[in-house]
Each structure stands twice: as C-alpha cells, then as structure tokens.
Amino acid sequence: MVLDPAHGGTDTGARGTAGIRESEVVLGFAAQVRHALESQGFQVVQTRLADENPSFDDRSALANAQSGAVFVTLHVSSSGLPGTARVYVNSDLPMGRESNGLIPWDRAQAPFLGLSHKFGDMVQGNLAQKFKGSPGSAQTCPIRQLRTTAAPAIAVEISSVTVTDRAALDRMAPGIADAITRGAAAFRPSYVVASQSGALR
C-alpha cells in the first residue's frame, strides 16, 4: 500500500476559516491509516512523513516502483458535506501506447481503471456504513495525482475544512482507517488474480 497525504510544505491545500489546514490534517490521518493497515499485515510506504511537498511525479514514481501496490491519496474537502467521506477514481483515460508499445506516463492509470473502480467501491461501501450521508459507491473525477499512477488508485476526500471543530474532524480518523483497511483486504484477492492472469500487461 502506498499512502499519500496530499499537499505539504508551502502547499497547505484547502484552508478553513477556523485555521484547519488540509495538509496538516491528512498527515495525522495517514498515521492512523498506516497503523490500521500494518496491523492487518499490509506493508505501507508513505509519500511523505513530514511537512514537505513531493511533486506529483515523485509521488507517482514512488508508487510505480512498488510491485503489486495499491495507491490511496488522502484529502480534506474544501466544500464537502461535513462528517462524510467520499472516494474518487480518475475519469476514463484513453489507453493509447507509444510506437514502442509503452504506455505514456500521463496515461499510466488507464490499464488499472477497472481495478481502481472496484477498490474504490469497496472502500466507499465501508465509509457509507460509518459516516451517514456518504455515497454508496466511488465517484469519478479528473485527478492529476492518480493519472500517472500505474496501480489501482483512489482518492479519499474527508469531511470539509469548513468545520469549526477540529476535534470532531480528528475523531473521524479511526473510521477512515478501518474503512480503507477493510476495503484493501476485500480487494486484495481480485488484484492478485488480475496480476497473475496477465490482464495488466
């Protein structure tokens, strides 16, 4: 599992009027998600562990270097419904290959979109059970970070920076961590089968 706390460094991401900063919140959430995943036997790599801002390409390159990994990027919404959580999968990408048969960097996600949808739906189903008002299935959106990731990849958008109670936002972390971990565990057999069948080549 490659876990990506979005933004960082001078890029704070979304900011709320109560001083909530997306980059700071997701770093804390990532620690709890990582603990939950590792407790279930997953190996976890994070794109950042401190207040720094790796580039989109650096984050994708880290994910693409991990064999058999899945990728989860964590965000806090700028205007979403407080107390809910939403999973996004990248919008459809044209498959396309270069003349040498290789898939272009900016379409690396294309072969994995079906698996990304499956993984996203599994995580979203768990989130919907924990957070009232959350959708029942993953949604699609053009997401720069996911486009160059050659692995099943989802974005998890948490609540909203518009909330005024940071403690209430932080209390969502265990539920987010559990939903991602349960979704990853349920998805793993499908990914193993797809990898072994050669469907991703």
Model feature map: region roles:
Residues A6:
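Extracellular repeat turn/loop positions enriched in glycine and acidic/polar residues, especially those
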Residues E24-R201:
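Active-site-proximal helix/loop segments of hydrolytic enzymes
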Residues G13-G28:
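Glycine- and acidic-residue-enriched helix-capping/strand-helix junction motifs
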Residues T10-A14, T164-D165:
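Short, solvent-exposed loop/turn elements at domain surfaces
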